[in-house]
Design a protein with these regions (language model features):
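Short hydrophobic beta-strand that contains or immediately precedes a catalytic carboxylate
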Residues: 149-153
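Structured helix-beta-strand junction loops
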Residues: 51, 145-146
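Internal catalytic-core helix/loop-beta-alpha segment
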Residues: 131-145
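Substrate-contacting helices/loops that form the catalytic groove of nucleic-acid
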Residues: 199
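Rhodanese-like catalytic fold shared by cysteine-dependent sulfurtransferases
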Residues: 2-132, 155-193, 202-348
Length: 348
């Protein structure tokens, strides 16, 4: 029996786009010491496949991190299975705020060294000794306190389209880079309230534990992240201190939280907060593109990529063989191929 998906990704994506069955986008995580990651991974894959779950699941000795899509009619069966696993009983399931059911098109369950890459090598660090969880109402109360410093634990391209009012938003590309930046920024503020947030909670849970490990006393994290916050403020009629869009790592690339558009198109500078991946298979750069520029550049990030896209498929394939994209994934929104960004770098 195959324990991984062998089907062509493009075909699966087209199948998902045309599917009419309602699906619910769900995310969850749990820091827990898993001893046999391979066996746990295989068992989980078989059960998720049987439930027609799609998405990405990362398993590591430190725990599990999942962003998935579940057929809505099977959501309760999925919940029963998941809660039947001892360490996952009662784990928070974050349901998407703005969901079209097209978030994922295939299932990947991968074993990794860590569920969140952090670059830390301190064997005395215990990720389970986290900061205090706060709900939306408590978050708002802390946010109004002059002694509170709010820190966005996401990457620059995420906070670019949406963030909390008065939050420090480090200009970083990766979580491991951000940990060091935040540590340096806060080194003389150990007695103040440190209030951290991220998309669903997994990054600020590790970050809050690390800051406590470093001696910070009053460390708080937004329970359930932006996803749960948006749901709570809507259900309870609370003040919404988040503005813009919540970036998500699936086909949607974002959830609309408020109507505020705080970013600009990376090609013309027009107000826009819609992310896209360059249509050139040799690039796939993530950037912000308005509708007009999408038409002008045929969904590409630059004239160069648009010209490449017009070439016959076999020539495009040959060109891709000579490209070493390396860690280009972390150049999201920074490439100087993008017209507006190129102009900004020259004038900035």
């Amino acid at each position: 029996m195959a324990l991984h998906n062998k089907f062509d990704g493009r075909l699966l994506k087209e199948k998902m786009k045309s599917a009419s069955e309602p699906r619910t986008t769900v995310s969850f995580y749990k820091y827990h010491h898993i001893t046999d990651t391979a066996d746990f991974r295989n068992s989980l894959y078989l059960q998720f496949e049987a439930l027609q779950v799609l998405g990405r699941v990362y398993i590591a000795p430190e725990g599990i991190n999942a962003q998935i899509s579940v057929p809505t009619t099977r959501l309760e069966a999925f919940r029963r299975y998941l809660y039947g696993i001892d360490f996952l009983e009662g784990v928070r399931l974050n349901l998407a705020v703005d969901d079209n059911g097209k978030s994922f098109f295939k299932l990947k369950v991968l074993v990794r060294k860590k569920i969140v890459a952090d670059g830390l090598n301190d064997t005395s660090f215990d990720v389970t000794r986290r900061g205090k969880h706060v709900n939306a109402e408590e978050f708002n109360q802390l946010a109004r306190d002059p002694q509170t410093i709010i820190v966005d634990m996401r990457n620059h391209y995420e906070s670019e389209v949406g963030h909390f009012i008065n939050a420090i938003r480090p200009d970083v590309d990766t979580f491991r880079e951000e940990l060091q930046v935040v540590e340096d920024l806060m080194k003389d503020q150990k007695d103040r309230n440190l209030l951290m947030y991220c998309t669903g909670g997994i990054r600020c849970e590790k970050a809050s534990a690390w800051m406590k490990h470093l001696g910070f006393r009053n460390v708080f994290q937004l329970d359930g992240g932006i996803i749960q916050y948006a749901r709570e403020v809507k259900e309870k009629g609370l003040e919404n201190r988040f503005i813009g869009k919540n970036f998500v790592f699936d086909e949607r690339l974002g959830e609309r939280i408020t109507l505020d558009i705080i970013a600009v198109c990376h090609q013309c500078g027009k107000p826009c907060d819609d992310h896209a991946n360059c249509k050139n298979d040799g690039c796939h750069l993530l950037f912000i593109q308005c509708i007009e520029c999408g038409e002008k550049y045929k969904g590409c990030c630059s004239e160069e990529c648009r010209e490449t896209l017009s070439l016959p498929p076999e020539i495009q394939k040959e060109l891709r063989r000579g490209i070493n994209k390396g860690r280009q994934v972390f150049k999201k929104g920074r490439s100087e191929k993008i017209p507006y960004m190129k102009k900004e770098s020259k004038t900035g």
